[in-house]
Amino acid sequence: MRIVFMGTPDFAEESLRALLEAGEDVTAVFTQPDKPRGRGMRESFSPVKALAAERGIPVYQPVTFKDGAATELLRTLAPELLVVVAYGRILPQAFLDVAKYGSINVHGSLLPKYRGAAPIQWAVLNGDKTTGVSVQYMAAAMDAGDVIAARETEIGEFETAGELFDRLKTLGAELLAETVRKIASGSVIRVPQNEADATYTKMLDKNMSPIDWNKSPREIVKHICGLNPWPVATTELDGVSFRVFGAEYTDARTALAPGKIISAGKAGIEVACGGGRSLRITEVQAAGKKRMSAAAFLLGHPMKADG
């Protein structure tokens, strides 16, 4: 079955690699145009383009899909299946309708939950116990197509969005390869999504970073984990602002107001939270410095307990 693959970041690269390792006939790849990256702002390939070039697969990078040229190009490639994974752009229906067996997409949630951007991060931010990946047929509405495969996984209590991203990247790639085989054999089953259960997410931004110490310890831990590796949780304690990469629960109860320092030492920085509880900050990063343990940070930035 002739497959045209569309994707850009490393999440998509692993899916492309899985198809190639499974022996699928990927005849062409579409990826976003090269963009300047790094301090020197040099143009660099996307992970998907790099893999395609390594394997000798033709790569196309249309700047626009509005003029119909990309759709005509796809028709000349005559794909039987279009696979889209984190391409990074909404595609016109005429483009999605070209492939004989349709267009499918890998999404980082158990649809219809968390349609849209950053589903992996929001699963962590919201404190979900489980999440997963879905393979869907692409529809006109965002992430609203029939689901043809899904796989669930537990979220670790202190698992970061970055760590979960890496796991779902692999899980999604494996599920995609299995699903493509089923499409080829005609054994795939389409399950319409229940619109009543649909939820939507939004992009993350730096305005979300500050920790709200009025929240419960678990909500704050999930805030820290969900914003790691970007945009990263931040706070200001004892007049010092820093990024927070790690924290742990304590059994302590406190009468101090949320955001007050209970203790600061070798174990970390214990801070009062909502509900008379607390948590301990264990890993931080000061401006212009490397990530370090809270204990190491305190050597250069000693803090006084408020109670």
How would you describe each model-predicted region?
Residues M1-G40:
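N-terminal Rossmann-like dinucleotide-binding module
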Residues G7, V29, A52, L82, ...:
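A residue-level signal for conserved active-site and pocket-lining positions in enzyme catalytic cores
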Residues A22, Q32, L81-Y200, N207:
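Donor/substrate-binding cores of folate-linked one-carbon enzymes
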Residues D25, G56-P58, G102:
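Conserved beta-strand segments of alpha/beta enzyme cores
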Residues Q32, P36-A78:
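N-terminal glycine-/serine-/threonine-rich beta1-alpha1-beta2 phosphate-ribose binding loop
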Residues K202-K215:
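Acyl-group handling in specialized metabolite and lipid biosynthesis
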Residues N214-G307:
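An anion-binding loop in the catalytic cleft
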